[in-house]
């Protein structure tokens, strides 16, 4: 596998560990991935959930935790690889999270769950902090590249193209996710590889394309590399590692899951998502969960209307209440059978 070049950086292992929140990919996991020569990604979604005072002031705790986890991940990495963050566009404090991450020294900022149309405006030093949108179609890629070109006279440092087999929030309709054979993801990747060429030529840069969603093993990696992409983003497989920041019970839920345990859900974020069908999912499919408190996490969320509080559901899960929490997962979770380490997993993937 060739190294991944992003701006001035050369990343020895062309693997990005996908951001997973709440609290699944923090400094322990991201730092370990970077130490192996890849790109470790911290999710900023309610990142401060374990900080003292979180129940009273989520915003302040999240900003403090962003700084803390980036510093700790870089310390673990020991100068290897890159440390980045994933910031969801849907977050109420999106701008503050991006600025805090850049100021704390995040090497890359990856942004999805909506189009990050204003992301370039939030980066003071584009030579220091590299940015990438997450897109799921050539149409979305063309739109964001055109917007950044027109409004900010710059382009993306790389593109993360997420297919329909990914976990968490997905840029596809529920109907598409229930009829996967009708989605030509390879075709979308090929179109994106063509559409980025105009902006590469205009700005005299290379825009690497990273394939994400359902990448499980070296066979999957070879398939997308043969299409012409520059690297892959993998998330679910990193959950069943010793270094993952989730509770042991959360990791065991992944290991014990079968393909038939997967559900397509509607998230309060306003997007469909892929998650484990546990007692929590079965309950909220039938009746609205009582919401006792709003954690002010999303720009567009009406507690009176949404079926459950996504912050509470995700925090319950990461802390180990795997029956009553929300467990996002990729489509290949049923193939995960045992715990491993980040070192061994990456050696397997690149071997």
Regions found by a protein language model. Name each.
Residues 16, 166-210, 216-351:
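Conserved active-site-proximal phosphate/metal-binding subdomains
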Residues 1-202:
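Active-site entrance/lid segments in N-terminal catalytic domains of soluble metabolic enzymes
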């Amino acid at each position: 596998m060739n190294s991944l070049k992003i701006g001035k950086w050369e990343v020895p292992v062309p693997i990005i560990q996908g951001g997973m929140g709440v609290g699944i990919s923090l400094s322990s996991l991201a730092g370990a991935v970077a130490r192996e020569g890849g790109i470790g990604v911290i999710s900023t979604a309610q990142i401060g959930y374990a900080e003292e005072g979180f129940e009273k002031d989520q915003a302040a705790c999240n900003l403090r935790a962003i700084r803390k986890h980036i510093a700790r991940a870089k310390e673990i990495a020991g100068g290897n690889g890159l440390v980045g963050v994933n910031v969801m566009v849907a977050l109420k404090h999106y701008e503050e999270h991006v600025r805090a991450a850049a100021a704390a020294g995040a090497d890359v900022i990856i942004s999805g769950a909506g189009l990050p149309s204003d992301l370039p405006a939030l980066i003071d030093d584009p030579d220091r902090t590299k940015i990438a949108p997450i897109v799921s179609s050539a149409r979305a890629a063309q739109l964001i590249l055109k917007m950044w070109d027109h409004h900010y006279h710059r382009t993306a440092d790389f593109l993360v193209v997420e297919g329909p087999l990914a976990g968490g929030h997905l840029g596809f309709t529920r109907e598409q996710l229930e009829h996967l054979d009708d989605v030509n993801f390879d075709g979308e990747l090929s179109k994106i590889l063509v559409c980025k060429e105009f902006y590469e030529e205009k700005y005299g840069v290379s825009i690497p394309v990273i394939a994400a969603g359902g990448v499980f093993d070296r066979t999957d990696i070879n398939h997308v590399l043969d299409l012409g992409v520059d690297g892959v983003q993998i998330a679910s497989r990193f959950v069943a590692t010793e270094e993952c920041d989730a509770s042991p019970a959360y990791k065991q839920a992944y290991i014990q899951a079968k393909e038939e345990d997967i559900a397509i859900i509607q998230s309060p974020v306003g997007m469909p998502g892929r998650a484990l069908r546990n007692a929590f999912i079965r309950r909220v499919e039938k009746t609205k969960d009582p919401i006792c408190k709003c954690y002010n996490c999303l720009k567009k969320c009406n507690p009176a209307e949404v079926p459950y509080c996504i912050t509470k559901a995700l925090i319950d899960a990461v802390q180990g209440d795997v029956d009553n929490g929300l467990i996002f997962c990729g489509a290949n979770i049923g193939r995960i059978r045992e715990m491993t380490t980040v070192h061994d997993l990456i050696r397997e993937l690149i071997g």
